[in-house]
Amino acid sequence: MEIKPITIYTGKTVPLFYDNIDTDQIIPKVHLKRVSKSGFGPFAFDEWRYLPDGSDNPDFNPNKPKYHGASILITGDNFGCGSSREHAAWALKDYGFNIIIAGSFSDIFYMNCTKNAMLPICLNQKEREHLAQFDEITVDLPNQTVSTVSQSFHFDIDETWKNKLIHGLDDIAITLQFENLIEKYEKTF
């Protein structure tokens, strides 16, 4: 899969301040009937996003006109908990999110984000509340900062994940960096 590198990214924000949003809330299991990574966006947050008649829920923040086109989700603690389905990351990416800022993430969900070219960022509640006041924010991955016009916040990220996202590398691309060594090994053994 081709991954678009993330270095400095400016995007529109949408707040969704709930804690413990699990993978079944992100993408209900009824929609897991395909293995392709695309096509899950319309089902992201399905039970919150739509009313029983199938129309958009006007009270769901991402449905509000002011948030249309948002690519940075600002949310609560323990985002992506629950089952380890990678479909949750696929749904959020297909919906249009490139960055998710939360208080914390499930470990498996965090990894699934990075494998699908989404940057998960952990910030405290005060920092997230500040960011949510702005329509757009800028994320500088090389310097590990999230900025508004008035303030910047530092975030931590493992160097391996950071390097993969900055250079647009997936697991296959990383493996192919060692192609000569692999071929040499195969010829030797």
From Swiss-Prot:
Pathway: Amino-acid biosynthesis; L-leucine biosynthesis; L-leucine from 3-methyl-2-oxobutanoate: step 2/4. Its EC number is 4.2.1.33. It comes from Staphylococcus epidermidis (strain ATCC 35984 / DSM 28319 / BCRC 17069 / CCUG 31568 / BM 3577 / RP62A). GO terms for molecular function: 3-isopropylmalate dehydratase activity. HAMAP family: LeuD_type1. PANTHER family: 3-ISOPROPYLMALATE DEHYDRATASE SMALL SUBUNIT (PTHR43345:SF5), 3-ISOPROPYLMALATE DEHYDRATASE SMALL SUBUNIT 2-RELATED-RELATED (PTHR43345). One of its GO terms (biological process) is L-leucine biosynthetic process. The keyword Cytoplasm does not apply. CDD domains: IPMI_Swivel (cd01577). Catalyzes the isomerization between 2-isopropylmalate and 3-isopropylmalate, via the formation of 2-isopropylmaleate. It comes from the Bacteria. Heterodimer of LeuC and LeuD. InterPro entries: 3-IsopropMal_deHydase_ssu, Aconitase/3IPM_dehydase_swvl, AconitaseA/IPMdHydase_ssu_swvl, IPMI_Swivel, LeuD. One of its GO terms (cellular component) is 3-isopropylmalate dehydratase complex. Gene3D superfamilies: Aconitase, domain 4. Pfam families: Aconitase_C. It catalyses: (2R,3S)-3-isopropylmalate = (2S)-2-isopropylmalate. Signal peptide: none annotated. The keyword Lyase applies. Belongs to the LeuD family. LeuD type 1 subfamily. This is 3-isopropylmalate dehydratase small subunit. Keywords: Amino-acid biosynthesis, Branched-chain amino acid biosynthesis, Leucine biosynthesis, Lyase. The lineage of its organism: Bacteria, Bacillati, Bacillota, Bacilli, Bacillales.
